């Protein structure tokens, strides 16, 4: 049977959900093919969304019309702002989720979205015509034809689950791997490598001894992810903290020879920032203990996820390890930890739209591109879906810059640098992180969302009013001169503020940590009518004024530099500071400008600086 649609999405994980929902929302006829409809939106690993860098991604996905934020706000068990005591640029919203509620909410959203149909089957191969994808075939002999195909297969491509010496061809424990599609992608000439990730054991909640464990609460004023969420007052559950100990470590050391990670059984490279417990014991042998979080998987607290204990050790060793830990002496393991090894395609095979360079109309998103994490997958799925629709409409692609969004940083890192280990987002990856805060996501991306038809007009108008109020009042504060007069000193004293000794502007005064919203309204009467969102932005802009201005200057400098043309006869060979790889790629692609050079995978900002210098020297000579 042959079925037709505009866009096919393969895989119903976090990338596939966003890709299919956004494409349908933008008016395309979308069909989602997934192995099991019941597992759409399943959180395969930890029961949490957000965190440092990841919270930024989730909020960006939300502003651009995505679903992850609203699903999380409707399924969370605990909400916190991480790094709350630090600056706003490095704070991250994180939520523990009820895995069942999240999955069911996501599935129902997908099944009830207009323009979006779903079928339960396995995609086996792509159909190509003249190096352009036109459809797929499935394991039940269905043929689906479409103008665009988005592959979001997660860990299922030639997936192998490892628990001790035991191996099985699974994409997730108990679910079949996608071997035919994996072979098809290799045959098409994509650069395929292997990666490894893992998950932690789960234990029965009624078998844990919580007495004596440190209780970890959610925030009193819980933060939420979606700007559409109203009247947020969720029921919050506690997590609990326990630790490994020298006995735990000795059990693991005694069984290193049985660990797939060390025996040579696993070839794929694992995540640097989420190592297994056996890897931690091996690499950090001097540490006497490692922190573990016991996280409820559902509102019923029937199972707890042991965060920090990712492992692929044999079953009997996992039992001993868990029973050596305080609070878990009599714990009943409901699900064992395991490692999973899988195929991924080097993301340097992609353009910034996430379309493959090799095959027109084929987009890749999520772990197939070498990333790890639900949020990274969701961000890619969203961007692939948007760009597939824009291509259908013959409209310009939607590419976010590194100075606009963490999504821009994520995709630029992937397609220009590639990866040889699971890529995870951190705030440290962004050069302009002071400009890319969670709190200003709406202001950064609202205009894009509205232009794409993904934000309501009335809300956008209010947002623009707020944006205008921020700029006008910052200008007014900069021009507002304060001198240490009796009146000014008296007013500062009444607000329990230190006096000023010299002439200052309003921005300098608001840069003080102690100058909160209440004091802002009291001291500067023109700020009194402003809403909390506007006041928060004014406060942050004042506090980091010098650094924010510097970052804007750097962006302007970079934008100016990227406009520089490269002479047709420019010789790249022999320029000090350019690696052999950079020279080879520049000679091969012959970019016409530094911007085109920046789009070539492997060309770094340092390479661009060197090129800029030598182009300038050549002009002057």
From Swiss-Prot:
Its cofactor is FAD. Keywords: Cytoplasm, FAD, Flavoprotein, NAD, tRNA processing. GO terms for molecular function: flavin adenine dinucleotide binding. Pfam families: GIDA, GIDA_C_1st, SAM_GIDA_C. FAD binds at residues 11-16. HAMAP family: MnmG_GidA. This is tRNA uridine 5-carboxymethylaminomethyl modification enzyme MnmG. It comes from Helicobacter pylori (strain HPAG1).
């Amino acid at each position: 049977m042959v079925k037709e649609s505009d866009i096919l999405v393969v895989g119903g994980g976090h990338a596939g959900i966003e890709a299919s929902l956004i494409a349908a929302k933008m008016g395309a006829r979308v069909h989602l093919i997934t192995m099991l409809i019941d597992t759409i939106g399943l959180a395969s690993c930890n029961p949490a969304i957000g965190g440092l860098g990841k919270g930024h991604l989730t909020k960006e996905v939300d502003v651009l019309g995505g679903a992850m934020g609203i699903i999380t706000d409707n399924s969370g068990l605990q909400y916190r702002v991480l790094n709350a005591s630090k600056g706003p640029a490095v704070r991250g919203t994180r939520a523990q989720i009820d895995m069942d509620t999240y999955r069911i909410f996501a599935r129902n959203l997908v099944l009830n979205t207009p323009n979006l149909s779903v079928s339960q089957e396995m995609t086996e191969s792509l159909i190509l015509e003249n190096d352009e994808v036109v459809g797929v075939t499935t394991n039940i002999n269905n043929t689906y034809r479409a103008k665009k195909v988005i592959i979001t297969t997660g860990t299922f491509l030639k997936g192998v689950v490892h628990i001790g010496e035991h191996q099985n061809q699974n994409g997730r424990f108990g679910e079949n791997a996608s071997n035919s599609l994996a072979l098809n992608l290799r045959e098409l000439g994509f650069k395929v490598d292997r990666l490894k990730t893992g998950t932690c054991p789960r234990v029965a909640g009624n078998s844990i001894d919580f007495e004596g464990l440190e209780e970890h609460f959610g925030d009193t004023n819980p933060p939420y992810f979606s700007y559409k969420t109203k009247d947020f007052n969720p029921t919050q559950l506690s997590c609990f903290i326990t630790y490994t100990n020298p006995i735990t470590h000795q059990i693991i050391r005694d069984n290193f020879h049985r660990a797939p990670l060390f025996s040579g059984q696993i070839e794929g490279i694992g995540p640097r920032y989420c190592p297994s417990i056996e890897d931690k014991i091996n690499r950090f042998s001097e540490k006497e203990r490692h922190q573990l979080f016991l996280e409820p998987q559902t509102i019923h607290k029937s199972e707890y996820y042991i965060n920090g204990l990712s492992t692929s050790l044999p079953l009997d060793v996992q039992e001993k390890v868990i029973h050596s830990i305080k609070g878990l002496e009599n714990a009943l393991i409901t699900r064992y930890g395991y490692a999973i090894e899988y195929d991924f395609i080097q993301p340097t095979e992609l353009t910034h739209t996430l379309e493959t360079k090799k095959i027109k109309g084929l987009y890749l998103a999520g772990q197939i591109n070498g990333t790890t994490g639900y949020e990274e997958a969701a961000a890619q799925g969203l961007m692939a879906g948007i760009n597939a629709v824009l291509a259908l409409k013959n409209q310009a692609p939607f590419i976010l810059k590194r100075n606009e969004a963490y999504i821009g940083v994520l995709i630029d890192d992937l397609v220009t640098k590639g990866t040889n280990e699971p890529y995870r987002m951190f705030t440290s990856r962004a050069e302009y992180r002071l400009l890319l805060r969670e709190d200003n996501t709406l202001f950064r991306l609202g205009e894009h969302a509205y232009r794409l038809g993904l934000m309501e007009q009335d809300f956008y108008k209010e947002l623009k009013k707020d944006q205008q109020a921020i700029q006008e009042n910052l200008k007014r504060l900069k021009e507002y001169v304060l001198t240490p007069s009796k009146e000014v000193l008296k007013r500062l004293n009444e607000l329990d503020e230190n006096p000023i000794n010299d002439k200052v502007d309003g921005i300098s005064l608001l840069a003080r940590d102690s100058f909160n919203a209440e004091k802002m309204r009291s001291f500067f009467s023109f700020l009194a009518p402003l809403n909390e969102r506007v006041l928060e932005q004014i406060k942050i802009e004042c506090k980091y004024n010098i650094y924010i201005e510097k970052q804007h200057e750097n962006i302007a400098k970079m934008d100016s530099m990227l406009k520089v043309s490269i002479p047709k006869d420019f010789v790249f060979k022999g320029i000090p500071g350019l690696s052999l790889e950079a020279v080879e790629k520049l000679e091969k692609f012959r970019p016409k400008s530094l911007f085109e050079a920046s789009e070539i995978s492997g060309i770094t900002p340092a390479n661009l600086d060197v090129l800029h210098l030598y182009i300038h020297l050549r002009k002057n000579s």
